[in-house]
Amino acid sequence: MTVGYDEEIPFEQVRAHNKPDDAWCAIHGHVYDVTKFASVHPGGDIILLAAGKEATVLYETYHVRGVSDAVLRKYRIGKLPDGQGGANEKEKRTLSGLSSASYYTWNSDFYRVMRERVVARLKERGKARRGGYELWIKAFLLLVGFWSSLYWMCTLDPSFGAILAAMSLGVFAAFVGTCIQHDGNHGAFAQSRWVNKVAGWTLDMIGASGMTWEFQHVLGHHPYTNLIEEENGLQKVSGKKMDTKLADQESDPDVFSTYPMMRLHPWHQKRWYHRFQHIYGPFIFGFMTINKVVTQDVGVVLRKRLFQIDAECRYASPMYVARFWIMKALTVLYMVALPCYMQGPWHGLKLFAIAHFTCGEVLATMFIVNHIIEGVSYASKDAVKGTMAPPKTMHGVTPMNNTRKEVEAEASKSGAVVKSVPLDDWAVVQCQTSVNWSVGSWFWNHFSGGLNHQIEHHLFPGLSHETYYHIQDVFQSTCAEYGVPYQHEPSLWTAYWKMLEHLRQLGNEETHESWQRAA
C-alpha cells in the first residue's frame, strides 16, 4: 500500500494489520509499516509485538538512545486522524474525546532526563546495556541446577529425596524464569538477538510459553501497570459479556488475572471471601505457574487472544503455533512422562505438582510485593485522565495520585527546588505503581533477577538486570528532583508482610463507589 506521510489512517485500519507478515503500528500519532523492518530489526522480531497496536510505550522504553529520524521516515506510511490519535470508538467514549492514542502524556522532561543520566552512568562505569559475564555464569549454574534437580527427582526415593529434588527443581525453574528468560524475552540478556531468543526459550524449557508471556508481561503488565481497563472492569463487576473487538491492550493481566478468586484492585467488586485473602492468598500463589502451563497458554494459542490483548502477531503464524505445541510436548515428556515412568504414575504426578507449586510460590512472592503493597497507586484509564469523579480514599488502598508520597510531591512543587511533572506522565505512573526492596544490593539484584529494582526495570525493560544496582541512585535522586514517588522497602521480608497486610485491607474495604454504581 502506497500512502503519504500526511494521509490519515483510521486506527481500526491499523488494528487490522496485526499479522507477522502484515504489521502496522501507531507511535505518537504516526502510522508505520514495520513488516519488512522486522527481519533486520536490531532487536529481532520483538518488534512484531507492536503489530496492530498503539506502540508508543514499547517504542519509548526499548530505545534508550533514541531512533534516527531517517529510519522512522523510511517506514512511516501515514498519521492517525485528528481527534482519534489511535483511539477506537470505545476509547473515544471512555476518554471523553481526548486526542491521545494512549492515556499517558509524554511532554515532561522527567523521562528524557532520566534516560540521559542512566546512559551517562553506564558509560561512566563501562557497563553494557545488555549482557555481561555475570549473567552468563549465573545462567550456566541455574541450568545445571535445573537439569540436575530433574535427574535427582527421577532417581531418588520418591517418599523423601525425590520430594526435596522436586522442590529444588521448582526453585531453579523460578530463577531460570527471573534471571534468564525474563531478560531474554525483553531483549536484554545479550547483544545478539538470536541469543536473546534462545534465552527467552528457557521459559518453554521449564513448561510455560515464552510467546504467551510476551503478551501477558511485555504488552499487558509493563505499559499498563496496576491499571484496569474500564470496559474490562465493568465486565468483571457486572458479569456482562464484553465484545472482544472493542477491547484493547490497556490493562494489566499480570496483576489482576486472579479475580474473582482474589481482589487486588479497589475497583473490583468485593466478595465475602475476600476478607480472608491475606490468609489463603499465599497458598493460591503456588498455583500461578501450573495454571499458566496447563490452561492459560493453551487457551491463548487456541483463541489467539490473552484477555483483551490480541495475539495474532504471533499465533497467526503456523511456524509459531508449531513451535508452541512442540515445546509443550517436549516438556510433558521430560517433566511429566519421565518422572511417571521412573517413579510410577502417582509419584510422578505428585513430584510434578510439588515442583510447580514451589516455582509458583517463589515467583509470586518476589513479584506481587512489587505492585500490591501499601503506597502503590491503582486506577482505571478514566481515573488517570481525570475524566471520572475523584476516587474516594480508602484506608490502606490508594487510588492514583492519592498516596502520601504523591500528595507530598504535589505539595512540594510550589517550591523552587522540585520541578513540575504531570502525574499522568508515563514514567511517573510507573513509579507510582511499583515498589523496590533491598535497593542497591548486588546479592538481591542477582538473586531476584532484578525484581528488587522494579522501578528501574519498568522504566528501562530493555536493560539487563545486571545494570540495575549501578543506576539505582540515579533513579532515586532524579525522582526526588522531580517530586516523583520512589518507594522502597528495606528487605523482601518487610515488603512481604506489608503485602499481606495490604491484601487484608483490600479484602475488607468496600468496593470503589464508581464500580458500585456500574454494577
UniProtKB/Swiss-Prot annotation:
Name of the protein this chain belongs to = Acyl-lipid (7-3)-desaturase
Protein's job: Fatty acid desaturase that introduces a cis double bond at the 4-position in 22-carbon polyunsaturated fatty acids that contain a Delta(7) double bond, resulting in the production of delta-4 desaturated fatty acid docosahexanoic acid (DHA) (22:6(4,7,10,13,16,19)).
Q: How does it sit in the membrane?
A: Multi-pass membrane protein
Cofactor(s) the record lists: Fe(2+)
Give the gene name: Fad4
EC number(s) for this protein? Answer: 1.14.19.31
What does UniProt give as GO cellular component?
Answer: membrane
The answer to whether keyword Transmembrane applies is yes
Name a biological process GO annotation.
Answer: unsaturated fatty acid biosynthetic process
Gene Ontology terms for molecular function? metal ion binding; oxidoreductase activity, acting on paired donors, with oxidation of a pair of donors resulting in the reduction of molecular oxygen to two molecules of water
Entry's family note: Belongs to the fatty acid desaturase type 1 family.
Q: Where would you say this protein principally sits, based on its record?
A: membrane
- The reply to whether Acyltransferase figures as a keyword in the UniProt entry is no
Every Cytochrome b5 heme-binding domain range: 6-81
Motif placement: Histidine box-3 = 454-458
Q: What is known of its domains?
A: The cytochrome b5 heme-binding domain acts as the direct electron donor to the active site of the desaturase, and does not require an external cytochrome.
What's in the keyword line of the UniProt record? Electron transport, Fatty acid biosynthesis, Fatty acid metabolism, Heme, Iron, Lipid biosynthesis, Lipid metabolism, Membrane, Metal-binding, Oxidoreductase, Transmembrane, Transmembrane helix, Transport
Residue numbers covered by motif Histidine box-1:
182-186
